[in-house]
């Protein structure tokens, strides 16, 4: 048995099989028949708290942390990580405390920040968003309390027995829970590419913790298979515990729902300033108890069990309090997102933020909240300021102002958008998802507008919001081309000295036009920086280096030719190209730091691309960059260049780097390594980077922004050039200005004025020409030869024929215009192409307008028209 532990044996725990779900569990109550899961025996703690006193969230957090900090084996307290995990690219949000240490620590690459550790990690899980406010227990954000240990072959900390012992001691010694009320349910665990056995901890039906014993990692070649996925043993064993802070607080208060236990002050504020009011505690407690036993949740079933189906007055009250619950929950989640400067948008984590905001706006409308969402943020922040560390009100106010306008515009356009997607008096689930995703129209508004338009109810599945969240939380990592190369461990000379442009190496591997050396000064493509070019000298011949790529520890050179293995060769890096790329790379870091200083701390690097002539930097920013912004940023960059700021590069141990520089380190990605190569420009920017850099900002020489644009909501692109490339760009602009000056016959400062003048004159001239054309066409049409009641014949030249044709298109009748070598036909009877085909084999056009090569007189045309009318 996986959990035949000394702790269980010495305390006389018994292992039983649940009479309801058949799972195995451990208990001190030998008469117990159920595992403690609410689906098996429901809640019994509401109004009967087993905890000796009531805690609030701050008190419970402190109680937990101090218990482990002051233990005989002291646990190191670790400050919470951000909720946006910029140290990994496979998830959008931190769902649990272990996310902080995947994959670097759990893979064995990096050491943990302490061992053992204790922390309280804010986490966001959006999958249950449909259930928030309904079940009494679901939240989109929560704090996961944890005490974790990382066990290595040469450093054992603690494993299953000690972990269970800790959980039991905390519950019984600190919270004074009756030991007979605690059950440990056996259950396998999977998450984030790892797996292991686990115990779920229940008290009176409430799951208060999960104790995970992680020792497996996903491995397609692994020898262990669990639920269709293959695993292999990890290089270390990790104790990953998760105690729900809010659940423990709820257990201590025994309130009807979790919301009253953790959001009491915020809820009171909302109820005081809205139409919402508390529903009877007895009824809310009953709803929570029934909801705990139902999986999947059904609102209809819950309401039928409390005998409230069809009670409109009660349903309005219930709907209002649920909206208030949703408001406080969403406000805390949004504040956590905003503390990490998430900008609402239609993609990735921004999509989830906008979803929460628009649901919040809708809740406020339903309960007629007398105030703004900022007021709610203030109230919630007052309750949770110990965990929401960054409350940037200016940033939040700007975001809310923009999002409120977008929400109003969405409401204005919603009816027409929804109307277009109605087919046979319904809207398919696919189109509902499209309306929500593309236009951001909440499901409730889709339902309301649909009913207004069709007088019918729209059937939207209860968990549809969960389906939408899954679509956006499913992060697809870019597939990397995997090639089979030997692990040569090429020594990179470009890090030791970026000035090395010549070197000697030995060919360790050769296959066609690909070679791997023992060492190289050629920088491989990576971090948005293109590969170096140059050549090798072999047997007196120059062999061009076309590309350089890194696969694992091997640096592969793609060459224009072949060089046999074991050859000793000399390499020459294209110095001009490398220097320009170094300038653009260092300039990118400078520009990012300046943009953050200028716009605010919400600026993060979204993506970059460096090149020879120009580079681009995409940053997070919620407004379009103006001309004034560009000038100010350029001036600030110039000041930094002229100030000769030093650029430092150093390798720092993973945890120390995070401690010293924070999570800005991961703006350009993250290394799968135990160290981070940190590039710092004095007091301007620090980030992890594997690229080549200058030693001082003065070597950037100059920086010029070429263009800016909004590439998607919340993302601004800056295209810029620096160094010699900036000089070439300026010279090109000067050449263009010089040509314009010559052409316009004005000095440079008058070019804009003269250009505007010419454009206006051109517009006026076009208007005049159009007027003259219309008058001339009218004269020809008026004097046209009438062939019959419907048809007219006009003789003209080629240029005038096209003008006349333009003004006959909107008239009734057939107009045949002869130029002498070509005939144009305009017909409101949709037979222009037929007439053209009868006049000539060489014709083209449509039913309305056609053209053919011929010189037919009016008599021939009369004959053809007679035939057509038959």
UniProtKB/Swiss-Prot annotation:
Its main location: cytoplasm. Zn(2+) binds at residues 585, 589, 689, 693. GO terms for biological process: alanyl-tRNA aminoacylation. GO terms for molecular function: alanine-tRNA ligase activity; aminoacyl-tRNA deacylase activity; ATP binding; tRNA binding; zinc ion binding. The keyword Iron does not apply. It is found in: Cytoplasm. Its cofactor is Zn(2+). Binds 1 zinc ion per subunit. The keyword Flavoprotein does not apply. Keywords: Aminoacyl-tRNA synthetase, ATP-binding, Cytoplasm, Ligase, Metal-binding, Nucleotide-binding, Protein biosynthesis, RNA-binding, tRNA-binding, Zinc. Its EC number is 6.1.1.7. GO terms for cellular component: cytoplasm. InterPro entries: aa-tRNA-synth_II/BPL/LPL, Ala-tRNA-lgiase_IIc, Ala-tRNA-ligase_IIc_anticod-bd, Ala-tRNA-synth_IIc_core, Ala-tRNA-synth_IIc_N, Ala-tRNA_lgiase_arc, Ala-tRNA_ligase, Thr/Ala-tRNA-synth_IIc_edit. PROSITE patterns: AA_TRNA_LIGASE_II_ALA. Catalyzes the attachment of alanine to tRNA(Ala) in a two-step reaction: alanine is first activated by ATP to form Ala-AMP and then transferred to the acceptor end of tRNA(Ala). Also edits incorrectly charged Ser-tRNA(Ala) and Gly-tRNA(Ala) via its editing domain. Belongs to the class-II aminoacyl-tRNA synthetase family. Consists of three domains; the N-terminal catalytic domain, the editing domain and the C-terminal C-Ala domain. The editing domain removes incorrectly charged amino acids, while the C-Ala domain, along with tRNA(Ala), serves as a bridge to cooperatively bring together the editing and aminoacylation centers thus stimulating deacylation of misacylated tRNAs. This is Alanine--tRNA ligase. It comes from Picrophilus torridus (strain ATCC 700027 / DSM 9790 / JCM 10055 / NBRC 100828 / KAW 2/3). The gene is alaS.
